[in-house]
């Protein structure tokens, strides 16, 4: 940081900069508190979502194993091929205290038997159940993915905000306080010297009676 002029205007300038830096640090702390609150809310949602995903995948795997046993892998593979599809995803960005956070949305993924590319009668009950459970798992997965993207972005922004707070509080503000003290001390010393010179001048040049 460059030194300010050792003048009263320089002192006022440094004090004004210190006030702005202090206000900036307070605003950043408020921002971090809001982001942290949002982060902890999301952590709870993500943990809950992962538990739902674990349960959905457990059901899907169990249903698939049963379908393989009852209908055979070859038949299931022949049904899976026409059932394949592209899933359109919509990614939007919202802002929390100016932080862009992505959100992923998809249409409903669980389909009726007649929407899987084959005649409904082609699907046995166990194969249809396995397909449904896997589609349900994908829905849960996409919901969690959106929240985890948001969680990661918030974590990055909290770290960046903390770095900025530390820079202000540990570097900028102490430097400005030190600079203000230096200028104030120099001005005080200058005032004392001026007072001494004035007294000497008056002593040498007394006013006429």
From Swiss-Prot:
GO molecular function, one term: proton-transporting ATP synthase activity, rotational mechanism
Gene3D superfamilies: 1.10.287.3240
Protein's GO biological process: proton motive force-driven plasma membrane ATP synthesis
Keyword Transferase on entry: no
UniProt cross-references to Pfam families, sorted A to Z: ATP-synt_D
Domain of life: Bacteria
Keywords: ATP synthesis, Hydrogen ion transport, Ion transport, Transport
Annotated family: Belongs to the V-ATPase D subunit family.
Function: Produces ATP from ADP in the presence of a proton gradient across the membrane.
Matches recorded under PANTHER family: V-TYPE ATP SYNTHASE SUBUNIT D
Protein name per the record: V-type ATP synthase subunit D
Organism: Anaeromyxobacter dehalogenans (strain 2CP-C)
Gene name of the encoded protein: atpD
